Amino acid sequence: MASQGTKRSYEQMETGGERQDATEIRASVGRMIGGIGRFYIQMCTELKLSDYEGRLIQNSITIERMVLSAFDERRNKYLEEHPSAGKDPKKTGGPIYRRIDGKWMRELILYDKEEIRRVWRQANNGEDATAGLTHIMIWHSNLNDATYQRTRALVRTGMDPRMCSLMQGSTLPRRSGAAGAAVKGVGTIAMELIRMIKRGINDRNFWRGENGRRTRIAYERMCNILKGKFQTAAQRAMMDQVRESRNPGNAEIEDLIFLARSALILRGSVAHKSCLPACVYGLAVASGHDFEREGYSLVGIDPFKLLQNSQVFSLIRPNENPAHKSQLVWMACHSAAFEDLRVSSFIRGKKVVPRGKLSTRGVQIASNENVEAMDSSTLELRSRYWAIRTRSGGNTNQQKASAGQISVQPTFSVQRNLPFERATVMAAFIGNNEGRTSDMRTEIIRMMESAKPEDLSFQGRGVFELSDEKATNPIVPSFDMNNEGSYFFGDNAEEYDN
């Protein structure tokens, strides 16, 4: 990362803005949120959704996916050049659920992409409002992070499934820009780089010619993004090596896996933002809330306040537990998939249980599932306290973590010891220590080994009462350290499949 002077807050990345003061940032983020809300209201009108149907999270997701698809330039171009049978490149759609005679029914809708782009631009003062689209992508990414595990993807790139806490944002599309890069975990970017290097090993022309030059620029840019996430000089120096390599190959892959592992203890900076489903913003706009005038922040109290008084419903499969479905969506709303469960439980005011103990599958419903057998219930998305979202990743304390996930990536800026099993992490570092990065590796391992509990617990602000909007009276919770800290412990979550 360049000097502090050029660092932009993520609200600025979010809105594509240059340096702004806090009020301007709040206003431009508010403008973006208001645009999403207005778009949602208009789509509900066009689709003739009742108030209840418009509050159904499954309908919200379908509408969100339609607008993302309508603006996916590269895919649209590809579809037009490679027509496939039965797919109209100019149309997009999905399942809309309607309540008919006391039963839920699924209706597959098709819409002109051009029409959706028109509605979106109209809701956003005639602009393309890319920031709003990215915001929706991050909400979908956070939902995926809470719902699925990425074991297969980790194993395929040579990483260890226990490193799942580094995989935030692993399903974000490439076009998600700076705001998307800010929320990606160290493992996610390492994995993208490893995939590039593997393609280069298998395809001699990958780095050659005009295309290869562009590829190289993308490679170096991604290296710089990853470098900017590390907080120690040795980790950054190692990233310089990876970036400057003439012909990236297995040595670089090794280095990247090493660096990703080191991030379990020497954590990277990963931003967290509360991105809510479009229907929540729609409800607020419909009730007269002026986001641009009031201002909005993705990392402060605002999303908590919004969720305190929004009623959102979800379809529930016959054997699912509605409380567990609520937990899943709550975690997604606050980007808390890799947060310590004790911290999440304290803030939420309800026990947050590990993924393996949840009796619920994902929020989205497959086309072959029988909707008539399903009921809908209110999602409980309220919280007892609020806390500022972190972007630092903090550092760690030697606490027991679990077999399934051996570290956490803090979401909330709350002081605590971090659960994590030093022995398990350090065991991964025996073996290969020669080659051009050996001195950096030695230095990194030394830092990891000497990490002392007291200087390394996460120094956060604490949590706040919901009435304490200016964050004046921090409450520092005390946690029972014998409790389970990780969400993906002993896990049986489904794999994420594109």
From Swiss-Prot:
Record GO terms (molecular function): RNA binding; structural molecule activity
Positions of the UniProt region annotated as Disordered: 1-22
Domain of life: Viruses
InterPro entries recorded: Flu_NP
Residue window of motif Bipartite nuclear localization signal: 198-216
GO cellular component: helical viral capsid; host cell; host cell nucleus; ribonucleoprotein complex; viral nucleocapsid
UniProt motif (Unconventional nuclear localization signal) ranges: 1-18
Listed Basic and acidic residues bias regions: 8-22
Keywords associated with the record: Capsid protein, Helical capsid protein, Host nucleus, Host-virus interaction, Ribonucleoprotein, RNA-binding, Viral nucleoprotein, Viral penetration into host nucleus, Virion, Virus entry into host cell
GO biological process, one term: symbiont entry into host cell
Family under the similarity heading: Belongs to the influenza viruses nucleoprotein family.
Subunit structure: Homomultimerizes to form the nucleocapsid. May bind host exportin-1/XPO1. Binds to viral genomic RNA. Protein-RNA contacts are mediated by a combination of electrostatic interactions between positively charged residues and the phosphate backbone and planar interactions between aromatic side chains and bases.
Protein function: Encapsidates the negative strand viral RNA, protecting it from nucleases. The encapsidated genomic RNA is termed the ribonucleoprotein (RNP) and serves as template for transcription and replication. The RNP needs to be localized in the host nucleus to start an infectious cycle, but is too large to diffuse through the nuclear pore complex. NP comprises at least 2 nuclear localization signals that are responsible for the active RNP import into the nucleus through cellular importin alpha/beta pathway.
Protein's recorded name: Nucleoprotein
Species this chain originates from: Influenza A virus (strain A/Swine/Italy/2/1979 H1N1)
Name of the gene: NP
